[in-house]
From Swiss-Prot:
Residues 460-484 are annotated as: Activation loop. This is Putative phosphatidylinositol 4-kinase alpha-like protein P2. GO terms for molecular function: kinase activity. Residues 281-287 are annotated as: G-loop. The keyword 4Fe-4S does not apply. SMART domains: PI3Kc. The gene is PI4KAP2. PANTHER family: PHOSPHATIDYLINOSITOL 4-KINASE ALPHA, PHOSPHATIDYLINOSITOL KINASE. Keywords: Kinase, Transferase. InterPro entries: Kinase-like_dom_sf (IPR011009), PI3/4_kinase_cat_dom (IPR000403), PI3/4_kinase_cat_sf (IPR036940), PI3/4_kinase_CS (IPR018936), PI4K_N (IPR045495), PI_Kinase (IPR015433). It comes from Homo sapiens. Residues 180-318 are annotated as: Pleckstrin homology (PH) domain conferring phosphoinositide binding specificity. One of its GO terms (biological process) is phosphatidylinositol phosphate biosynthetic process.
Length: 592
């Protein structure tokens, strides 16, 4: 019945979102079938067969018929006889092992039935490997059981004197550079409301960005601040428009008092806040097409749903090369100011966003925040500000205590539920960013580039040094992972503490996920390879070779775990992290 009704093991596969193509309507998350009933049922069948093969030929015939109906000779078709999700691997191969046991017991007299059943068993086994590999979503106990089942199937298959090999070929992504041509073709084909929507959006954004050019001639200080507020007050909100850094929300209003010039005298970036209504890309397009540039009344952007309305901060900049310097502005109480956009930052954030989608897809409870950086033209761009965040640098300027003291004052002592939840958030974000710091070799990790949000997550920003570049003339002084004493204190104070063991366990899980046994290493390597010809300073000839080595390819699970554990141990309370913080304090007045 479960075969005909497509339940459990025989259910149709739910297509999971590709981490490389995640969208509002297609969020990456695991979609395993419910196979627990089949686990129980097949266990019963295995136990029953051990009795039936000695005493009941009728029951053996029923078993043979059941197996024949449950399996198929088809391999790799769009609709397989069984679900190919990794969560269904246990019951699938347990059923196949039962089939081999029936053949080996020599209780099926008909040779034709035996041969067909044997072929169906092998075809069903091959069929599982006809789809791209996936990372396990099962719990630890169930995963161990599934691995044990696979070993038993291999043993049974080996005794059957049949050898199966499978070649899994993942074709490279077909990536071309036809973007400019596509943009010209698309914009040239616009007319009517669509063209008005396009022109209205770019006109609004150009006016917002041009404030940077207006304030550039003014000296830093009160004069530039006044010029910024004056220029911002002349910007009128266009109906149905969005920010490039936040295309899922309609801009309702501008906080004309929020204009804040950054510290850079030459580039003149500034921060502004906008009231936005989050509605999704599809709804925004509908709203934009309903609006007319000469009539805001026709645009249905009523502020009916208060939960969808919020204030969003962003940084705008109009100037020349935006790659050479970092910009830090007046320290905001709720939103943090990030460095200006660059191709290198965008590459790092693309990879971080990819890992975020991968973590969601495989059900790994890790946290990263890939804030958006959009380069709109050479030297021009907009950056999404991280809400409800404070930098470790800002924390040091406002108070005289470290991160651990901040946690105890903010969330209570270690026995409180609030502290434990914040610590858990800290650990799962530390594990994710530690893996990324190691894989991408992200450097310049001073306290100005480390953030804490109100939930306890740690967030890294500013990726000006990565791969084969590092501060101080590429000295490579900093360790692979930043694990300072205050970070360790939050995670228990020592490596033997339970919270720190959680951290190491999460790092090991994430490392094994990203290594060669999973399908994701090639995706990251390909993404970096595409950028090699850009001339970014982080590429010095050995980037891909060293990146592949850090992924610990060709290692067993145990070897990969030992590999990342040694990295963590070598970075634990490293003096190089502390001395780098001291250097930043004396050179750039960044507290530590």
């Amino acid at each position: 019945m479960t075969v005909e009704q497509k339940f459990g093991l025989f259910s149709a596969e739910i297509k999971e979102a590709d981490p490389l193509a995640a969208s509002e309507a297609s969020q990456p998350k695991p979609c395993p079938p419910e196979v627990t009933p089949h686990y129980i049922w097949i266990d019963f069948l295995v136990q029953r067969f051990e009795i039936a093969k000695y005493c009941s030929s009728d029951q053996v015939e029923i078993f043979s018929s059941l197996l024949q109906r449950s399996m198929s000779l088809n391999i790799g078709r769009a609709k397989g006889s069984m679900n190919r999700h990794v969560a269904a691997i246990g019951p699938r191969f347990k059923l196949l092992t039962l089939g081999l046991s029936l053949l080996h017991a020599d209780v099926v007299p008909n040779a034709t039935i035996r041969n067909v059943l044997r072929e169906k068993i092998y075809s069903t086994a091959f069929d599982y490997f006809s789809c791209p590999p996936k990372f396990p979503t099962q719990g630890e106990k169930r995963l161990r059981e599934d691995i044990s089942i696979m070993i038993k199937f291999w043993t049974a298959m080996f005794s059957d004197k049949k050898y199966l090999t499978a070649s899994q070929l993942v074709p490279p992504a077909d990536i071309g550079d036809l973007l400019e041509q596509l943009v010209e073709e698309n914009t040239g084909s616009l007319s009517g409301p669509a063209k008005d929507f396009y022109q209205r959006g770019f006109d609004f954004f150009n006016k917002i960005t041009n404030v940077s050019a207006v304030i550039k001639p003014y000296p830093k200080g009160d004069e530039r601040k006044k010029a910024c507020l004056s220029a911002l007050s002349e910007v009128t909100v266009q109906p149905g428009c969005s920010l490039p850094s936040n295309p899922e929300a309609i801009v309702l209003d501008v906080d004309y008092k929020s204009g804040t010039p950054m510290q850079s005298a030459a580039k003149a970036p500034y921060l502004a806040k906008f009231k936005v209504k989050r509605c999704g890309v599809s709804e925004l397009e509908k709203e934009g097409l309903r609006c007319r540039s000469d009539s805001e009344d026709e645009c249905s952007t009523q502020e009916a749903d208060g939960q969808k309305i919020s204030w969003q901060a962003a940084i705008f900049k109009l100037g020349d090369d935006c790659r050479q310097k970092s910009y830090w502005g007046a320290r905001m109480p709720t939103d943090r100011i990030l460095r200006l956009p660059a191709s290198q930052d965008m590459l790092a954030l693309q990879i971080i966003d990819l890992f975020k989608n991968i973590f969601q897809l495989v059900g790994l409870d890790l946290f990263v925040f890939p804030y958006r950086v959009v380069a709109t033209a050479p030297g021009c761009g907009v950056i999404e500000c991280i809400p409800d965040c404070t930098s470790r640098d800002q924390l040091g300027r406002q108070t005289d205590f470290g991160m651990y003291d901040y946690f105890t004052r903010q969330y209570g002592d270690e026995s409180t539920l609030a502290f434990q939840q914040a610590r858990y958030n800290f650990i799962r974000s530390m594990a994710a960013y530690s893996l990324l710091l190691f894989l991408l070799q992200i450097k310049d990790r001073h306290n100005g580039n480390i953030m804490l949000d109100k939930k306890g997550h740690i967030i890294h920003i500013d990726f000006g040094f990565m791969f084969e570049s590092s501060p101080g003339g590429n000295l490579g002084w900093e360790p692979d992972i930043k694990l300072t004493d205050e970070m360790v204190m939050i995670m228990g104070g020592k490596m033997e503490a339970t919270p720190f063991k959680w951290f190491m366990e999460m790092c090991v899980q994430a490392t094994w996920l990203c290594g060669e046994p999973g399908p994701y290493m090639d995706v990251v390597v390909s993404l970096v390879t595409i950028m090699l010809d850009t001339g970014l300073p982080c590429f010095r000839g050995q980037t891909i070779k060293l990146l592949k080595h850090r992924f610990s390819p060709n290692m067993t699970e145990r070897e990969a775990a030992n590999f990342i554990m040694k990295v963590i141990q070598s970075c634990f309370l490293s003096n190089r992290s502390r001395t780098y913080n001291m250097i930043q304090y004396y050179q750039n007045d960044i507290p530590y």
